[in-house]
Amino acid sequence: MMRILLFLATNLAVVLIASITLSLFGFNGFMAANGVDLNLNQLLVFCAVFGFAGSLFSLFISKWMAKMSTGTQIISQPRTRHEQWLLQTVEQLSRDAGIKMPEVGIFPAYEANAFATGWNKNDALVAVSHGLLERFSPDEVKAVLAHEIGHVANGDMVTLALVQGVVNTFVMFFARIIGNFVDKVIFKSENGQGIAYYITTIFAELVLGFLASAIVMWFSRKREFRADDAGARLAGTDAMIGALQRLRSEQGVPVNMPDSLTAFGINAGLKKGLAGLFMSHPPLEQRIEALRRRG
C-alpha cells in the first residue's frame, strides 16, 4: 500500500509540474486565443482520476480475472506428489524472498508458461501450465517459479499498473486537447462540443494509446531482467539459464495466455522488427546473455 501511495504522490507532482509548464509556455493563452475555453488544471485532474481508476481496478481484480480467464485450479490440498512438490517449492522460494506464500495453481495449457498476479506482494497468485510441469525438469520448473516469485517480491504488478495509470492520464489529456482544438479551431463549433470533438478524441485516444503502449512495454521488458536476476538468486544462475534455454527450444509453440497476463508470464512469444517495441518480454537470447554476464 505504501508503494501505491508514494507512486500516486509522485504522479500528482508530475501532473502539477505538467500543468505549470503548459501555463509558463502560454498554452492556455494560445488555446483561448483560438476560441478553446479549456481549464487545463481541471482536465488534468479529471484524466488522472479516470486514468488511475481503470488501472488500479484491474489490479485489484487481477487474481480473480486470472483464475477465470485461464481456468487455473488452486491447489489447496495437494492430491499428488507433483502438487506437493510444487507447494513446497513455492513455500521455500517465498520464504527466501521474504514474502508471504502466494496461492499456487495449475492452468490447462500445452505451452510451457507461468504467471504471477495480485495487487499485493503478500496476497498474490503464482500459476504454472500443465505443459511446463510435464516437459521441464524439476530444476527448470523451480527456476521458472523463482522468476515469478521475483515478480511478486519486486512488486511488479503494482508498479506496472501505476505506470499504466500515468500513461492513461496523459493519453486522455492530450486526446481531449486535440479534440477541442480540431472542434473549435478547424470546424469552428460554437455551442458546446460538436461531433468533431468526439470523433477526434476517440481517434486520438486510439493512436496515442497505441504509441504509448510502447512505453509500458519498455518498462515491462526492464522488469523481466530484474525478475530473471531474482530467479537466479533464488534458484541458481545455471538453473535460470537452463529454464530460459528450454523455453527458447519451445518458441514454435503458440502462446495462448490472455493479453492481460502476458506481461506477467515467463514466455510471451516472439516478435521481430518494429513489433519488438511492443513486446512485454525481451528476446530470450538477451535474457540468457544478461544472466551469463551476471556470473
From Swiss-Prot:
Zn(2+) binds at H147, H151, E224. Binds 1 zinc ion per subunit. It is a multi-pass membrane protein. It comes from the Bacteria. One of its GO terms (biological process) is proteolysis. GO terms for molecular function: metalloendopeptidase activity; zinc ion binding. CDD domains: M48B_HtpX_like. The active site is at E148. The chain crosses the membrane at residues 4-24, 42-62, 158-178, 199-219. InterPro entries: HtpX_protease, Pept_M48_protease_HtpX, Peptidase_M48. Its EC number is 3.4.24.-. It is found in: Cell inner membrane. Keywords: Cell inner membrane, Cell membrane, Hydrolase, Membrane, Metal-binding, Metalloprotease, Protease, Stress response, Transmembrane, Transmembrane helix, Zinc. Pfam families: Peptidase_M48. The keyword Cell division does not apply. GO terms for cellular component: plasma membrane. Its cofactor is Zn(2+). The keyword ATP-binding does not apply. Belongs to the peptidase M48B family. This is Protease HtpX.
